[in-house]
Amino acid sequence: VAVVDDDNIPYKNWGKKLLINNKIKTNFYKTSSLAFDPISATNHKNLWHRGFPIQILDKRNNVKKKIKTIKPDIQADFWNGDPDIDAICRMEHHPICKFKDKYFPLASNKVSPFNSQNTFISKKVLPHYFLFPHIGRMDDIWASFYVLSKGFKVVYNKASVFQKRNVHDLTKDMLKEFIGYENNLNLIKDLKKNIKNINSYIPEKSRLAFLRYQTHFK
């Protein structure tokens, strides 16, 4: 299943030669930090992915790289143009990016944010992948933390779209991201302890919606 935003313009390679469910060699980044920032492993190291815990931004480059073979369940393709960064990062940099192919595919030993903008998800992940409503701009980010904490693996691949971002009010975006600024780090910690701890972070109506969604896979 592919999830794509309407402001992404696909390249000719979009959706071709997918990596999920195949054994592939990756640029694998090992970190002792609680989370990994995939953008930090590219030629745009000054930026960070939306959802990466801002409390550990100064540690995002503390990684060791090696070549490792993995079998990913999720493939998060990158995006040239306007990247998926948080409002703070966008206010500071206002970047237009061209990510170099040589950095991909890449993966890590730790939880890392991926979005619903240009992502391919295998069948076995679907019952667990849910864009939690009522949590602002963290719906897809917390979905990524949840499935990765359950043990599914993500690989980040080279850009397959150009994002021409729709008009946004960055102050409003930032307000919708505050739930993440405040909770992302602790959520990652708590999901590591017990996957059911997601229920301590999402509203009751989100929890019930997730339960209803999962009934479609029984």
Label the predicted regions.
Residues 125-129, 133, 137, 153-177:
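Active-site donor/metal-binding and catalytic loop motifs
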